[in-house]
Every structure is written in C-alpha cells, then in structure tokens.
Amino acid sequence: DVYRSGNDIRLGIKMGAPFFQIKNELEAKEVAVFSSNYTLYGDMSRRVMSLLSEAVPEMQIYSIDEAFLDFSFLEKDDIHNFAIQLAKKIEKGTGIPITIGIAPTMTLAKIASHFGKNYNGYQHVCIIDNEEKRKKALQLTSIDEVWGVGHRLTTKMRNLGINTAWDFTQTN
C-alpha cells in the first residue's frame, strides 16, 4: 500500500492504493518510492510519543503517527507558545517535524492539524478556538477530508449537496 508525503497529496496520489495500480503514474510524476521499514517507524514513533507524554498530563495515542493531547492544564493565552515549543522540542529530539492542531473536539483538532501542515503561515501549529475560526475551517474542508467519512458516505453526501464539513453541520 502507498503512504504519502505532503507533496504526494498535492499531486493527487491516493492513500493506501496498492503500488502496482499506480506504479506508472508515480513514475510519470517522478515520485521517489521507498519500501517500508516498520521497525524504524515504530522506534521513531515511540520516541515522539515519549516526548509528547512528558509534556502533558494526559495523552491518547491514536496511531503510529498521531496522538491527542490534553492542553486543558494551560491558560488559553499560553497554549500557542507551548505548542510551538513542543513541536520544536520534538523536531530537535527526533529530527521529525510535527504539526499540532488544537481544537475543542478530536475531529476539529484533526482539521486544525491539516491546516497547520498545509499552510505555511501557521508554523505547524493551528488553533481553532472560536466560532469564526471553526466556521472558516469547516467551510474550507471538503467532506471527504473529514475524519471517519469514507468514500461511500462521501458519495451519498455529495448527492445530497453536502460538499464541505460546514455543509454537513448545517443539515438536520
């Protein structure tokens, strides 16, 4: 299966596609292909997760490269700087740049993380902490990018005129 970097996403390469199905497309786009080293990935993940867990009182590991952190122990005005410093600490300690998305729900945090990763102005930390930011983020998020919305559900929603996460929030 294929796993992508940010550039691969912008080229339209599909996540999880079997390599043999997209081999010609990858070659045509001059994409570098590497085999997986799950032992190394697991070791690096443990290092990152260890550093994250030292920084916050509560953490939920979601996958090999994702975790949800509880920042409620911080004052609201301190969260952004704390997150930037944490991201720098992780990169310095592991060589791995991370993105931190902060929001009141896990789904919004994943959307915030997407913005932090894909828009340079955020410096890898995006916070959705008010209604204006929530509305803007949801309006800019395609329904197929929402956590838990798969291909079949995306098709059904689009047939109902639901194209963005914002559209979804406006339905009954």
Region roles according to the model:
Residues 35-38, 73-78, 124-125, 140-145, ...:
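Flexible, glycine/proline-enriched loop segments at strand-loop-helix junctions
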Residues 47, 51-55, 85-94, 156, ...:
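Generic non-transmembrane alpha-helical segments
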Residues 100, 138-161, 166-172:
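Helix-hairpin-helix
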